[in-house]
Curated annotation (Swiss-Prot):
Belongs to the snRNP Sm proteins family. InterPro entries: LSM_dom_sf, Sm, Sm_dom_euk/arc, snRNP-E. Core component of the spliceosomal U1, U2, U4 and U5 small nuclear ribonucleoproteins (snRNPs), the building blocks of the spliceosome. Interacts with the SMN complex. The lineage of its organism: Eukaryota, Metazoa, Ecdysozoa, Arthropoda, Hexapoda. One of its GO terms (biological process) is spliceosomal snRNP assembly. SMART domains: Sm. The keyword Cytoplasm applies. This is Probable small nuclear ribonucleoprotein E. GO terms for cellular component: catalytic step 2 spliceosome; cytosol; nucleus; pICln-Sm protein complex; precatalytic spliceosome; small nuclear ribonucleoprotein complex; spliceosomal complex; U1 snRNP. It is found in: Nucleus; Cytoplasm, Cytosol. Residues 17-92 form the Sm domain. Coiled coil: none annotated.
Amino acid sequence: MSFKGNPKVQKVMVQPINLIFRYLQNRSRVQVWLYENISLRIEGHIVGFDEYMNLVLDDAEEVYVKTRQRRNLGRIMLKGDNITLIQNVSPTKD
């Protein structure tokens, strides 16, 4: 008797805090979408975070979506209440 069909593959759930920690460990450049501000994004390297998703970003920049204009901010602390999405923008895949 042969098995036809796909074997059942169990997927492992990735916790959000683990993904943020991986970005921190790999020093990945991330882009943060802001809550209720769709015209502005923040990019930088995560150097710290806490259980409230407050982030400390190094080499942070404001990126204006429409004009692609950038403004250097340096090291900042971004409150978790303002975060809608965090995505990797580093050239290498994590």
